[in-house]
């Protein structure tokens, strides 16, 4: 890369230092919680739109394929929490969530929105398709292990101890329960609790 210089353009070249080329793919990418396949290429995009219904006044689950800075988080979310620990207390299983400022690709979060949102739009974000595997949150107290797994496409999780999330509550998933894209579900190992509490 160079700049042509000199009067009359005499083919003198000046090199540029500290240059970075960025791939923006198609300038706009649109994602939806109803997507059955996640086939977006990794890379930085000028604009990414996420079609997802988030209800005001409730804790919604969100798992995005790109990082968000604290400034980007505040655009739509007034509160964000991530799973930090799990505790077995008799017949109860307590899931403890802590406040977060940033959001990491592939990690499922509980979020609150100031008003109901159906479309989110973000600029200059970098999509990482593999983050859905590496971003799963796993916590344990020795007696019970909880794995909060995000989704980038619709999935039907299998297992005896799988919980689907509806705003404010996890409930035992029936066989064949479909989890929407950009959400998440919970798997427990070592215990079948009567009650699952969120704190």
Regions found by a protein language model. Name each.
Residues 82, 87, 109:
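Contiguous mid-protein beta-loop-alpha structural module that forms a pocket-lining wall or clamp
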Residues 89-96:
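Short linear interaction motifs
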Residues 26-76, 96-168, 173-199:
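A short, polar beta-strand/turn micro-motif
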Residues 4, 22-24:
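Predominantly extracellular/luminal cell-surface or secreted proteins
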Residues 17-21:
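Extracellular beta-strand elements of beta-rich domains used
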Residues 2-13:
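Short beta-strand-plus-loop segments that form exposed binding edges in beta-rich domains
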